[in-house]
């Protein structure tokens, strides 16, 4: 089986599926693009096409928080109530670190009452939602539960501590330093994104149709960044050479002894003694994967503007390739 076929096994659902793929391993490079930025246009996807990163965005939020920590403006142990005094009292037990590694137990904003006709929620709406809560799912720090709410709150903390908008902060303190000059933080209805891919779904006849937004796709902290293959290649090279990365890649043991392989915006696993760092993204009409390994001299980036694709499968396909099980 060829490498492309192995990596994309159970990932490509139709010949018209839009995607951009980059794979590098020890001098071998595979690059491939397919499809249109929108089913409504004739514009082809390229390596400069900007896709919504979905949860891959969390790396950039975490990186920004680590910046502020290294500048001694906050610490990993800063409790959230000391930043937002109008949040419920239980936030005095939740730290920056708990938000970063998903051990806070705060409620999922996706469980808010809503209808498809409601306006899209913004990050500030999630802060207001948290003010109405009175408990967590579990005792803080005792379990891992992936939390989009936590990363929205982290994005708001970046704004509050830096006294800059999240888009201004990331574009000046992360994107520019990494050379990612075409990447954007999307403020819905405001930001103009060049070369933008729009999300799609498949109908019952397996035909593409545009489905790019829904009620919770306008938030920033949990998934509102846009980038391309070419810019994400720059990000990988930049990230691994920063002191922030040392903090971000570290996994944790939580208080019940369970191993938490989620660091700070990055998941870390070990394959045959080699560390692999990655994050997947999943939102309406779009799925993403950013994966790299210093040990293996490897990088894999996959962006598709077709929803309903589990990019964890591609990560598992890669592991099979590494283990020689093909």
Outline where the language-model segments fall:
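Short, well-ordered beta-strand elements
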Residues: 30, 278-279, 288-306
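Short, glycine/proline-biased beta-turn/loop segments that scaffold the active-site neighborhood
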Residues: 75-90
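Short, conserved catalytic-motif segment at the N-terminal edge
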Residues: 2-51, 73-75, 132
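Short beta-strand scaffold segments in enzyme catalytic cores
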Residues: 19-23, 267, 290
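Structural recognition of the beta-strand scaffold that forms the well-ordered cores
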Residues: 20-22, 98-100, 299-303
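Short, surface-exposed loop or secondary-structure junction motifs
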Residues: 91-282
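Active-site SXXK
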Residues: 5, 27, 52-77, 154-159, ...
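Short, gly/Ser/Thr-rich active-site loops of penicillin-recognizing serine hydrolases
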Residues: 272, 307-326
């Amino acid at each position: 089986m060829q490498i492309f076929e192995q990596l994309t096994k159970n990932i490509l659902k139709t010949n018209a599926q839009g995607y951009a793929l980059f794979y590098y391993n020890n001098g071998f490079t595979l690059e491939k693009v397919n499809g249109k930025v929108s089913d409504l246009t004739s514009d082809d996807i390229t390596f400069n096409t900007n896709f919504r990163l979905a949860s891959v965005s969390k790396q950039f939020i975490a990186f920004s928080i680590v910046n502020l920590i290294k500048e001694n403006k906050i610490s990993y142990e800063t409790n959230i109530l000391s930043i937002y005094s109008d949040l419920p009292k239980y936030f005095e037990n939740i730290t920056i670190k708990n938000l970063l590694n998903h051990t806070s137990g705060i409620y999922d904003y996706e469980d808010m009452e809503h209808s498809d006709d409601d306006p899209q929620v913004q990050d500030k709406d999630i802060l207001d939602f948290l003010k109405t809560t009175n408990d967590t799912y579990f005792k803080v720090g005792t379990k891992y539960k992936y939390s989009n709410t936590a990363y929205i709150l982290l994005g708001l903390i970046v704004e509050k501590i830096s006294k800059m908008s999240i888009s201004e902060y990331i574009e000046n303190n992360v994107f520019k330093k990494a050379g990612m000059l075409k990447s954007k933080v999307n403020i819905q209805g405001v930001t103009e994104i060049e070369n933008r891919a729009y999300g799609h779904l498949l109908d019952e006849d397996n035909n593409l149709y545009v489905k790019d937004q829904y009620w919770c796709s306008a938030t920033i902290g949990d998934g509102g960044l846009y980038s391309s293959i070419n810019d994400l290649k720059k990000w990988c090279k930049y990230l691994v050479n920063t002191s922030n990365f040392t903090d971000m890649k570290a996994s944790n043991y939580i208080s019940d002894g369970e191993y938490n392989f989620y660091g700070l915006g990055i998941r870390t696993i070990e394959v045959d003694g080699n560390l692999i760092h990655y994050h997947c993204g999943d939102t309406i009409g779009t799925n993403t994967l950013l994966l790299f390994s210093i040990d293996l001299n490897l990088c894999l980036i996959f962006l598709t503007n077709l929803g309903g694709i589990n990019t964890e499968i591609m990560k598992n396909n890669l592991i099979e390739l590494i283990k020689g099980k093909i």
